[in-house]
C-alpha cells in the first residue's frame, strides 16, 4: 500500500541541515546551550513545515471545548500536554492527519505490547538508512530539564549493589539459564545544574500490536485541577515559544493560543481581525477619495 513520505523524518532532515555547526559531537558531550540550539532548530522546523503545508492550528478561532477535545495527550497516563510540547504535537498531528492526538514513549508502547513500525516510502517500499538498514518510523523530540537521575548504588567497597528479583509470592525468580535472577539497585541523585534532555514521543498509530484496550483517554479532570492551581499561583505561568526564533506574528499567535489552552479560555485571533478591519477602512477611505476626485 502506497504511503506518503514520513513527515517526521522530513522535519528531522531539515533541522539537521539548518544547524550551523555540523561537526559531530555526542549528545552527552554537548553543553546545555548546544543541546538547546539543536532542539530549538528542530522545533522551529516543525512549525515552519506546518506553515508551509497550511496546517496551522493557531490560524483559526477555537472555543475552550474544541481546544480541550483536541489537546495532545499521553495515552498511557491520560495526561494532556501543554505549552511548547502541545504546540509541536498539535502541528505534527495536523501534518500527519492523526485522527486522535494520542502519544506514547517507546518504553510505554513496549510495555503495552507495541513494536515500532518500519518506515515506508511513497510507494510502500522500506526506507533504508545510510547504513543500508531498514529505517523505523520517526517520533517527535520533546525537550525537558532533568533535575535528578537514578544511578547504580555502590556498597562500601565501591561495588555495584544488586538484589534478588522475586515473583508475586516472594520467591526468587530463576532465569532460562537456570540461575537466580538479580537486578541492580539504584539511587536518586540531584543535579546541581539541571541537564537538558529530550524524550521522543510517538503517535499510537506508529506501533504494531499495541494493546489498544489498555490505552487511556484524555484526562480533562486533571487538566482542570492544573488550571485551578494556576489561577491561585503568583507566578507568570504563560507558556511561550519565544526561544524558537520564529516571526513576530507567528510567535504572538502561538503564544496566545497556548495561553488560552493552559488557562481554559476561548482562543480568537483578535489582533488579526484588527489588522483586517484597518485594511478595510483604508480601502473604504481610498474609494471615497477616488470618488471625490
What do these predicted regions represent?
Residues 2-292:
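N-terminal accessory/interface modules of nucleic-acid-binding and processing proteins
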Amino acid at each position: 500500500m502506497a504511503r506518503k513520505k514520513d513527515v517526521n523524518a522530513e522535519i528531522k532532515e531539515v533541522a539537521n541541515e539548518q544547524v550551523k555547526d555540523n561537526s559531530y559531537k555526542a549528545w552527552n558531550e554537548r553543553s546545555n546551550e548546544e543541546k538547546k540550539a539543536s532542539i530549538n532548530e528542530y522545533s522551529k522546523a516543525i512549525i515552519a513545515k506546518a506553515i508551509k503545508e497550511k496546517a496551522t492550528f493557531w490560524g483559526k478561532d477555537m472555543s475552550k471545548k474544541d481546544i480541550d477535545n483536541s489537546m495532545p495527550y499521553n495515552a498511557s497516563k491520560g495526561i494532556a500536554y501543554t505549552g511548547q510540547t502541545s504546540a509541536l504535537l498539535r502541528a505534527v498531528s495536523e501534518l500527519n492527519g492523526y485522527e486522535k492526538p494520542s502519544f506514547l514513549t517507546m518504553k510505554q508502547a513496549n510495555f503495552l505490547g507495541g513494536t515500532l513500525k518500519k518506515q515506508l516510502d511513497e510507494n510502500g517500499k522500506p526506507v533504508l538508512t545510510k547504513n543500508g538498514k531498514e529505517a523505523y518510523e520517526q517520533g517527535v523530540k520533546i525537550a525537558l530539564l532533568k533535575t535528578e537521575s537514578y544511578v547504580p548504588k555502590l556498597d562500601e567497597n565501591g561495588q555495584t549493589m544488586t538484589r534478588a528479583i522475586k515473583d508475586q509470592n516472594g520467591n526468587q525468580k530463576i532465569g532460562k539459564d537456570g540461575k537466580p535472577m538479580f537486578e541492580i539497585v539504584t539511587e536518586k541523585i540531584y543535579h546541581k545544574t539541571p541537564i537538558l534532555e529530550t524524550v521522543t514521543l510517538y503517535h499510537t498509530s506508529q506501533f504494531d500490536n499495541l494493546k489498544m484496550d489498555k490505552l487511556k483517554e484524555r484526562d480533562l479532570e486533571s487538566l482542570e485541577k492544573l488550571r485551578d492551581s494556576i489561577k491561585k499561583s503568583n507566578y507568570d505561568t504563560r507558556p511561550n515559544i519565544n526561544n524558537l526564533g520564529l516571526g513576530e506574528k507567528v510567535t504572538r499567535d502561538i503564544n496566545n493560543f497556548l495561553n488560552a489552552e493552559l488557562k481554559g479560555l476561548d482562543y480568537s485571533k483578535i489582533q488579526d481581525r484588527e489588522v483586517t478591519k484597518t485594511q478595510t477602512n483604508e480601502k473604504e477611505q481610498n474609494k471615497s477619495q477616488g470618488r471625490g476626485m
